[in-house]
A protein has these predicted regions:
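Conserved catalytic core of nucleotide-sugar-dependent glycosyltransferases
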Residues: 115, 125, 134-204
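Active-site acidic Asp-centered loop
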Residues: 73, 125-127
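N-proximal low-complexity "stem/linker" segments adjacent to membrane-targeting elements
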Residues: 1-60
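Acidic donor-binding segment of Leloir-type glycosyltransferases
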Residues: 57-99
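Short aromatic/hydrophobic "clamp" motif used to bind/position activated sugar donors
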Residues: 122
Length: 272
């Protein structure tokens, strides 16, 4: 049964109050865990700079043991990337690398990476988002506590890159609601039991809606999805050839708070 100190929070909850509730929840959940299961991180990338950033974030993760299945979509590893991977290896993080051509879809890439994974859980991470050091461990904590087949984060923090603003969106409803059963979580935070994800067809073979493919497949098979708090993850919105053009007003109008730049707090990894 899940432990829920956060479920009494509402849109008037301050950031310090949110952090306090999260820390209490972590303490409760981790006091019950004797051993962590194996986790395979799935990462598809086609941007060298973003790969550098996410490799640094993986190196900072507090989850003691995990491995990385890395898909290079039309790019090559630089000397700097290789040094980062060597640092992961020294941390006993096994890194499996596969190259993919331009014509291969995102769904095909992620499904291929998932099929090569060995962990009891798979964790999808996106190269253009921001992850705090407790990210993976928080997700596993929630999975073990709730028994959910899939766990992921709410969309509470969004970085609007063209505006250089991070907005905090917190409400007891919609995509901002936390610590509850749901049919949706942020795609860049999906943690799923490997066998359940495989039965759902992994991420399909399309170029879009790959996260929804997985989540729908899980629920259609009778699996349950738990959405935990968003703090510790920042979803990045920008204008590029591979992301949707977004009306930023929906994020600004729904914001409880906003800060210039990327939110600077240890839960997000500190200053970037």
């Amino acid at each position: 049964m899940a432990s829920n100190p956060i479920n009494t929070m509402d849109r008037f909850t301050s950031f310090p109050q949110e952090i306090q509730a999260i820390e209490a929840l972590r303490k409760t959940r981790r006091s019950k865990i004797k051993k962590y299961p194996t986790v395979s991180v799935l990462l598809s990338t086609l941007r060298a700079d973003d790969l550098s950033n996410v490799l640094d974030q993986l190196l900072a993760q507090t989850l003691v043991t995990f491995d990385l299945v890395l898909g290079l979509h039309t790019i090559e590893l630089s000397a700097s990337h290789k040094r980062q991977i060597a640092a992961l290896n020294r941390r006993k993080v096994k890194v499996v690398i596969q190259k993919f051509t331009k014509d291969q879809t995102l769904g095909t890439i992620l499904s291929t990476l998932a099929s090569q994974s060995s962990g009891k859980y798979i964790a999808k991470m996106d190269d253009d988002d921001y992850y705090g050091p407790e990210h993976l461990r928080d997700l596993v904590d929630a999975a073990l506590d709730t028994g959910a087949e899939v766990v992921g984060r709410a969309m509470n923090y969004v970085y609007l890159e063209p505006l250089q603003l991070t907005v905090r969106r917190f409400a007891p409803h919609g995509t901002q609601a936390v610590e509850l059963w749901s049919d949706w979580v942020c795609g860049g935070t999906i943690l799923a039991q490997r066998d359940v994800a495989e039965a759902a067809g992994w991420f399909g073979d399309g170029n879009t809606a790959v996260d929804r493919f997985m989540l729908s497949g899980v629920t259609n098979n009778g699996g349950k999805i738990w959405r935990t708090f968003g703090a510790g993850y920042i979803y990045r919105r920008t204008f590029t050839f591979h992301t949707y053009v977004t009306n930023y007003s929906k994020y600004l109008n729904g914001a409880n708070e906003q800060v210039v730049g990327i939110w600077d707090h240890p839960i997000f990894g500190g200053e970037r």
